[in-house]
Amino acid sequence: MALEIDYVLSHISQEDKIALLAGIDFWHTHPIPELNVPSIRSTDGPNGIRGTKFFAGVPAACLPCGTALASTWDQNLLREVGVLIGKECLAKGAHCWLGPTINMPRSPLGGRGFESFAEDPHLAGAMAASMITGCESTGVISAVKHFVGNDQEHERRAVDVLVTQRALREIYLRPFQIVARDAGPGALMTSYNKINGKHVVESKEMLDMVRQEWKWNPLIMSDWLGTYTTIDSMNAGLDLEMPGPSRYRGRYVESALQARLIKESTIDSRARKVLEFVQQASRAPVSAVETGRDYPEDRALNRNLCANSIVLLKNQNDILPLPKTIKKIALVGSHVRTPAISGGGSASLEPYYTVSLYDAVSEALPHTEILYEVGAYAHKMLPVIDRLLTNAVMHFYNEPVGTERILRATQPMSKTAFQLMDFNAPELNRGLFYATLTGDFTPDVSGVWDFGLTVFGTGLLYVDDELVVDNTTHQTRGTAFFGKGTVQELGSKTLNAGQTYKIRIEYGSANTSPMKAIGVVHFGGGAAHLGACLHVDSAEMVRSAVKAAAEADYTILCTGLNHEWESEGFDRSHMDLPPGIDALITSVLDVAANKTVIVNQSGTPVTMPWADRARGIVQAWYGGNETGHGIADVIFGDVNPSGKLPLSWPVDVKHNPAYLNYASVGGRVLYGEDVYVGYRYYEKVGREVLFPFGHGLSYTTFTVSPDVVFSQEVFRPEEPPTAAVKIKNTGKVAGAQVLQLYISAPHSPTPRPTKELHGFTKVLLQPGEERVAHIRMDKYATNFWDEIEGMWKSEEGIYEALIGTSSQNILAKGTFRVDRTRYWLGL
């Protein structure tokens, strides 16, 4: 029997009606079976569908990270990605996808910058809308997030974002506005932070903007543990508190109702919205059990997506593509055999598979001799034990070790790392429990092995019953596990290759830890990461890498950051590569600069002090399952690179506009750069960047006609004009070029950015082919937020349309006019 909302509301008890307004557990809404109200499942994350388990999860497709997706500048491709996301949700039994993330990476240091799309709100909104449209075409609801201002991780639950109304509207709300207009997703997730003194989840002004001004009526849900009050959040418009069991609704709502602090009509309105969400979501044909769908066509899409996201930053003397006739190639770097497929936090998942660059090069060059050297490790924590681990199992108890214990649950393990935030077992006390992880560790090299144990909770490591690491009483807070974990505590032991040793971790859950922290999210459960590595001689590793590079015909040096450096829960403290990486790159370039290509994997910019010496630099982001294939396809010319930077790439962290106003100080952060975010700032102050917004090279060449032709000379918001230019592929291979339309208001009496992106198109051309490319402006192209009037304003006057292949490479110009000044609100 179908869900009938009016029938449910007329027959439901007050208790059940209030119960609808919060989740029943970590991922599900509250069901009412007797009224045919099913439970709806939500799931992370931004680059793949994890399902209901952080711990021992079902494998999934891992897509490239958000900045990689935006680097394609391809809305049609992102619609396909959205469809794949929707299908993965259906396979995991999930009705609602918690994504995408469209916060603004105002600083390169943001921990979740890799999850977001772009520093430009138009690009971020357009790409997100395409992805959402694809996802919701499968019946799965998208919950776009985080509304609004969750642009840093430091004290994200407590920080007060102080931002002008103009910057809030033009930069931070604009992506949500575009998504509301172009996609209208069924759900919206609020942010953890405050905006100008009020938590967004409690701000009637902010939530009314969505529903009243924008005429968009999604289910509004909290971020996980991002509800802080009963009365204010209910009256502001928050429909659903997540996760469950509820902390601020239930009996507290009943009490507030009796005190007339919440109206009956408000409860009815929130319950109706939840039921509308349930009604829409329950139509999705979800799987009854969580499963995978690792299909060939999905692999092909993921590989194409990865390759098309890659940005060719530098190609001096056309070092790329490399010839496939190479007799000897050196593969150097931490990421050659261990690719960074995603960032950390909500983006984490268990992938179906991972293709390394080593594997991909071996496939592409089957007759080439490969010299492989790590050169320098890039890990922040010692690598988790998996390949050398057998017979691993984890036992759960309510009692600590050394007491009489009753076994409550058992879980086979494939590696020595786990997160237990959503782990449940019958009779296990979620508030306080203990676990013992045992397994057989067989090292492949003799020598001194270093062990590192990081915990959210407490932990002891034993090797053959000898205590090697104690991470219990003297704990120091680190950045792992959403910012709740300790730093890595280290110990060492001499081991023999081929001999099997008994590994044992005695673990206590989160509440056994004495550490406390402000502003971070306490998801509960706990977590641990045990890593191990042969104690290495760093100088000898570099010498071996240099020797390989000197001997080889060409060298690919692949390194960068990973999920330990970029993750939800903390921000980066600097923009540098991990310790020792720059020295490795410099040493290799000293002997092989003319035959070395540098491949960087990171979700946001890193410093490149060696950039002027490198002939080839490739930005490969976090590329998902097909990372190795995508990189190799570009490097050897099977794919002509067409990616464009969605972020400006500063020379130094001190140059970025948020440098003096980043992180929470005294409980607040001042957005002092105002509307001058990213390229808007660098251009306004004349600050040189290493690579500009929109930059990306190709293996072919293009010409663009110098004059922009308009479909109409007068700009009318109700029917914006189209700008057109001719573009020709003048090279020898097929290639795609992204034409970017920037609008400038050079005569405006109001201080404005030099130019702003308001349209783009990606054009694929065969060698010698010429085409007219059309770019449609949107309604917002000439507008800014007038803080006095509290409305959008389009000033009368002459405007410039600038079309180029980056924010700094403008190839065509034209002018148009606005015939009269207009004010407006809404979408």
Curated annotation (Swiss-Prot):
SUPFAM superfamilies, per the entry: (Trans)glycosidases, Anthrax protective antigen, Beta-D-glucan exohydrolase, C-terminal domain
Group of enzyme by EC: hydrolase
Major subcellular location class: secreted
Pathway terms, separated by semicolons: Glycan metabolism; cellulose degradation
Gene: bglH
Name used for this protein in its record: Probable beta-glucosidase H
Known role: Beta-glucosidases are one of a number of cellulolytic enzymes involved in the degradation of cellulosic biomass. Catalyzes the last step releasing glucose from the inhibitory cellobiose.
Hydrolase listed as a keyword: yes
The keyword Glycoprotein belongs to this UniProt entry's keyword annotation: yes
Glycosylation site list: N471, N594, N600, N625
Active-site residue numbers: D223
Biological processes, Gene Ontology terms: cellulose catabolic process
